[in-house]
Amino acid sequence: APAGRKGGDSLALSIVREYIGEQTEVRCCHFPMSADSAEKEAVWDEVAAALVQEVEAGKQVGFITLGDAMLFSTWVFLLQRIGNPAWLEIVPGVTSFAAIAARSQTPLAMEQQSLAVISCTAPEADIAAALRQHDSLVLMKVYGRFARIKALLAQAGLLDAALMMSEATLPGEQCWRRLREVSDDQPLPYFSTILVNKQWEYAQ
């Protein structure tokens, strides 16, 4: 199970803990949120090698993750190292933005609409271009970047077509439907995402 802090609990593990049998061995792995590529790659190498070693020893091994394992997930860096062995099965998950769409009753895309999933770590010019080009957008990794993204939405005239949700489906879930009223320095949880649909009227 991945853990955001060394020695800390795993959010993914807390969600599935009640379904884990007493005989199941659980290991939490700290994946550093660091700009140091060498540090991160060393951890990915170590965890991937340990996972393969356990499987080759005859054990059934699972790696749990939040959302879908193939979208903005630490798992993909392990997958690069593991390859495509016959024993590997990846179970589809529910993406955060699919959960947000359901919780907010906001469609992601309809009929001929285009849908773009954008990381807010992208250059501002790329985000601005995406806001112009697409009918519906998912803006992920908003944490620490809200003021910049809010300004881009305002420039595009899309503040009223957007909503933001944090920690969707979790006990701390929060939703903001009027982004123009949200302060630029509003404290946000790490898991915060913005949905934009230019052709949908939100219930107030």
Residue ranges and their predicted role:
Residues E46-E54, P107-S119, E181-T193:
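A polyampholytic, Gly/Pro-enriched intrinsically disordered region
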Residues C28, F63-T65, I90-G93, M110, ...:
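General beta-strand structural signal in soluble alpha/beta enzymes
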Residues G67-Q133, D185, Q199-Y202:
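Class I SAM-dependent methyltransferase SAM-binding "motif I" and its flanking Rossmann-like core
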Residues P2-A3, S14, L131-Q204:
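A contiguous loop/helix-start segment that scaffolds small-molecule binding in enzyme catalytic cores
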Residues A1-P85, K150, C175-W176, P189-T193, ...:
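Class I S-adenosyl-L-methionine
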